[in-house]
A protein has these predicted regions:
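Pre-Walker A (Motif I) flank of P-loop NTPase domains
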Residues: 24-29, 128
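Hydrophobic/aromatic beta-strand patches that form the interior of the parallel beta-sheet core
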Residues: 29, 56-58, 132, 147-149, ...
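Glycine-rich phosphate-binding P-loop
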Residues: 30-48
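Flexible active-site lid/hinge loop adjacent to a nucleotide/diphosphate
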Residues: 157-173
Length: 210
């Protein structure tokens, strides 16, 4: 049985940082969670807490496909959002693979709001750096992450905290939970129904195949 431990928002950051400090060299961290769980905020706080260890946050939505591709079936096709919006090949090519090989990372490819390519400058990171990729529905894709964190919301909390204009993603998030089982894939699960009083559930069994 997985041990669940109550903590604080600062305690969540400390737990993630401890996982990273246990690994030498360059580390690729993913913080996965529905937008309502705000994985980007946790990613930013982890980057700040890692200092002076170099770290860079990459938002997964800055690696979405162009609108002409991802919106082929409409603006609110939840299955396309789950399976097709993320440009996995670009994320591998510009971030995950070169970071390990050379330390070079392109922090963003496209502005998810304007759909325009961004003029990001390639960043050269040292051998002990951490790249933090934050976003939704990122696990179970076979992407090469070294440390995995999933921020979990119960179905009730997810419905309550998801803005009305994003409610069309709820069926996809349900399918993601059922089919990809992100909790079983994560090194650390953050139970965040109460953002002031979260809980931690470290993994106690080997993860399923990617």
């Amino acid at each position: 049985m997985t041990e669940v431990r109550a903590t604080t928002p600062a305690g969540v950051v400390d737990a993630v940082v401890a996982l990273l400090h246990a690994r030498p060299g360059r580390v690729r961290l993913v913080i996965d969670g529905a937008d309502a769980a705000d994985p980007h905020d946790l990613g930013a706080r982890v980057v700040a807490a890692l200092a002076p260890r170099p770290a860079l946050q990459v938002r997964a939505d800055s690696y979405w496909r162009p609108a002409g591709q991802r919106l082929e079936y409409g603006h609110h096709d939840d299955m396309a959002w789950l399976d097709d919006w993320l440009d996995e090949d670009a994320l591998r090519r510009e971030v995950l693979d070169p970071f390990v090989a050379t330390g070079r990372v392109l922090p963003a490819l496209r502005d998810p709001v304007t759909d325009r390519s961004v003029r990001a400058v390639v960043v050269q990171l040292p051998p002990d750096a951490v790249v933090v990729v934050s976003g939704s529905v990122l696990l179970g894709r076979g992407l090469p992450f070294d440390v995995t964190v999933h921020v979990r919301l119960s179905p009730a909390a997810l419905r309550r905290r998801t803005p009305a204009d994003q409610s069309w993603t709820l069926p996809a998030l349900e399918r993601y939970t059922e089919e990809r089982d992100p909790e079983s894939r994560a090194d650390l699960v953050v139970r965040a129904d109460d953002p002031i009083r979260p809980a931690l559930a470290p993994r106690t069994a080997p993860p399923p195949p990617a």
